Amino acid sequence: MDVQKELEKVIELTRSQNRWRRTETINLIASENVMSPLAEALYMSDFMSRYAEGKPFKRFYQGTKYVDEVETLAMDYMNQVTGSKFCDLRPTSGTLANAAVFRVLANPGDKALIAPVQAGAHVSHTKFGTLGALGIEHIEMPYDEENMNVDVDRAVKMIEQIKPKFVVLGGSLYLFPHPTKDLAPHVHSVGAKLVYDAAHVYGLMTGKVWSNPLDEGADFLNVSTHKTFPGPQGGAIFSNEEEEFKKVSRTIFPWFVSNHHLHRLPSTAVTALEMKVYGEDYAKQITRNSKALAEALASFGFKVIGEHLGYTKSHQVAVDVKNLGGGAYVAKTLESANIIVNKNLLPHDPPEAVNDPSGIRIGVQEMTRFGMKEGEMEEIAELMKQILVDKRDINEMRRKVTEMRSRFLEVKYALTYDLSKYNSKLIPMIL
């Protein structure tokens, strides 16, 4: 083996990824985002080589004095932007945050109610994901087709009849808020807990364009830190109930996480500070952009889901593309032109259509952070029409998409700081 040539392969693949996804593609994956240059710079630190099992100032390792301080700061900043009393940043994903909470609230064989799959329930809420792995029986609450949401009246009856250990709201195809305030009193009346999975909408929540579930009766708020909240990949658990929170916090280590990827912590802290300053403006622009994209797509003849409800109140837009070849074909075709979306089940799709659903899911949060606004959403919709409906030459369309993206390469809604005075050997993100 020529090690030097093999090394060059790895480096070139990394350079190619950075060039393609960071400078050439219009990224519309609803579960992704981009950190600020400052947050990225701090991500590349000695923290990534270290361990710190346990909680701050109560570790099972030595050498953690700076870890303890930065983790405490990060939790404090996150509580500030969330409006919560308690935070745990050790889950390394939103799914692990869910797992820790679910495991404490129920035992194998117990029942949990979840939002209906048609209303966007995440796979971790189902028998195919975390609940199934934990042996907890999940039961879907009734679906209201007209409102594309949980049917509150029938869900209340189900809660009173089944008396589950907990109820889960939130989801992954998530256009409209779930009825936290309407269900919380009934959940608590049967001695159950209400868990809200805000992985997708956490940044909208901290930006005050999405209601805070903790203010509406949720006992736990589980999130991802890298979707509409534009931080490093990771998870977090929030609560205002000290005793319940302590029970969950005690289980994260050693049940679900040993080392919790410490290099996330400075970047998470920086992102929280950025959202304290810019979060409301960012979230408002996200929702303006998603609405503008939905309306523009509809004007070009696309079958955008939820027209009678105003299409969306989140960062997402859902489009039925069955008549254009289906979700799998459309997602691949758009990718060939450098527009990145994902195929997605729509409310009317059967679960077995997961590999070739009728829909695509679009998220505008990353392109919003690169400075795109309503006018650019209309331009994206027209590009999609030219690719999928007019069937323009794919190479020509790729050039047009890349040219458009070249105008939006600077991350907005971000703090800056001159790190050069530290003479740090920071590894640049773009090689």
From Swiss-Prot:
GO terms for biological process: glycine biosynthetic process from serine; tetrahydrofolate interconversion. It comes from the Archaea. This is Serine hydroxymethyltransferase. Belongs to the SHMT family. Pathway: Amino-acid biosynthesis; glycine biosynthesis; glycine from L-serine: step 1/1. Pfam families: SHMT. It comes from Metallosphaera sedula (strain ATCC 51363 / DSM 5348 / JCM 9185 / NBRC 15509 / TH2). GO terms for molecular function: glycine hydroxymethyltransferase activity; pyridoxal phosphate binding. The gene is glyA.
